[in-house]
Amino acid sequence: MAILINKKTKVICQGFTGSQGTFHSEQAIAYGTNMVGGVTPGKGGHTHLNLPVYNTVHEAKAKTDANASVIYVPPGFAADSILEAIDAKIEVVVCITEGIPVLDMVKVKRALIGSKTRLIGPNCPGVITPGECKIGIMPGHIHKTGIIGIVSRSGTLTYEAVAQTTAVGLGQSTCIGIGGDPVNGTSFVECIEMFLQDDETKAIIMIGEIGGNAEEDAADFIKQSKIKKPIVSFIAGITAPSDKRMGHAGAIISGGKGSAKDKLEALQSAGVTITKSPADIGKTMLDLLNKI
């Protein structure tokens, strides 16, 4: 069953005719994703990659019945693109763009309340249900249909977890990059809740990092959840100094809050299995499942 997306998902691309939109749409089509068109204002009526181009998301949805959109738009315009997709009632919106101003995202976050849209990202690799639908910039070939749900704040560490769970034969049900910005659309808690309710997902890998309290919130949720599944977690930034941003905009220990130590302690107290090295994620999960 997987979560969020599957082979029936109809996907449009905002920023379709740009270099990033073109390249990653080609990759998605080659993977087998059901791409049905794209949006570039001023280029409506043309075709691109043998798909129709529309001026607005409203028009694209009306003509294609799209229920998902991926956004490859520069930071200054990305929030407006998300708002347009929300206004058009697109169900799943994946925003890849890094560097969107925080105040822009606060407006987006407010618009999401009570809407029909789930936003993944921004500043994320996207979402993939292996063998069915790839929305984002992740390398499709490392994925394998399987039983592990993966959710991560880091793109490249997601790929590590994917490659390792593929190598040990477990595969993935769905993989979600929630993004590394301080304000994002979907949290660890929301993703873990969906994975816990999904029959095909037998276990979960959660990859966090320093900054914020998303991992602590996830630990509280896991502790209180009536549904239990094996969960392995890796937290990046154990040696990170305070008050220094480490890559992602949200990866900063500020005011003594958001350290890896705090996150690890919270997750361990919730019964999550911790791996100290990203190289051991797949093996740790396999060993955990073999013990059950």
UniProtKB/Swiss-Prot annotation:
PANTHER family: SUCCINATE--COA LIGASE [ADP_GDP-FORMING] SUBUNIT ALPHA, MITOCHONDRIAL, SUCCINYL-COA LIGASE SUBUNIT ALPHA
Pfam families: CoA_binding, Ligase_CoA
Disulphide bridges: none
One GO BP: tricarboxylic acid cycle
Keyword Disulfide bond included in the entry's annotation: no
InterPro entries registered for this protein in UniProt: Cit_synth/succinyl-CoA_lig_AS, Citrt_syn/SCS-alpha_CS, CoA-bd, CoA_lig_alpha, NAD(P)-bd_dom_sf, SUCC_ACL_C, Succinyl-CoA_synth-like
Active site: 248 (tele-phosphohistidine intermediate)
An example molecular function term from Gene Ontology annotations: nucleotide binding
Family: Belongs to the succinate/malate CoA ligase alpha subunit family.
Classification via SUPFAM superfamilies: NAD(P)-binding Rossmann-fold domains, Succinyl-CoA synthetase domains
Assembly mode: Heterotetramer of two alpha and two beta subunits.
Gene: sucD
Pathway: Carbohydrate metabolism; tricarboxylic acid cycle; succinate from succinyl-CoA (ligase route): step 1/1
Domain of life where this protein originates: Bacteria
Entry protein name: Succinate--CoA ligase [ADP-forming] subunit alpha
Role, per record: Succinyl-CoA synthetase functions in the citric acid cycle (TCA), coupling the hydrolysis of succinyl-CoA to the synthesis of either ATP or GTP and thus represents the only step of substrate-level phosphorylation in the TCA. The alpha subunit of the enzyme binds the substrates coenzyme A and phosphate, while succinate binding and nucleotide specificity is provided by the beta subunit.
GO CC terms, sorted: succinate-CoA ligase complex (ADP-forming)
EC numbers: 6.2.1.5
Binding site for substrate: 159
Catalytic reaction equation(s): succinate + ATP + CoA = succinyl-CoA + ADP + phosphate; GTP + succinate + CoA = succinyl-CoA + GDP + phosphate
Binding residues annotated for CoA, in chain numbering: 17-20, 43, 96-98
Keyword Ligase annotated: yes
Keywords: Ligase, Nucleotide-binding, Tricarboxylic acid cycle
PROSITE patterns per the UniProt record, alphabetical: SUCCINYL_COA_LIG_1, SUCCINYL_COA_LIG_2
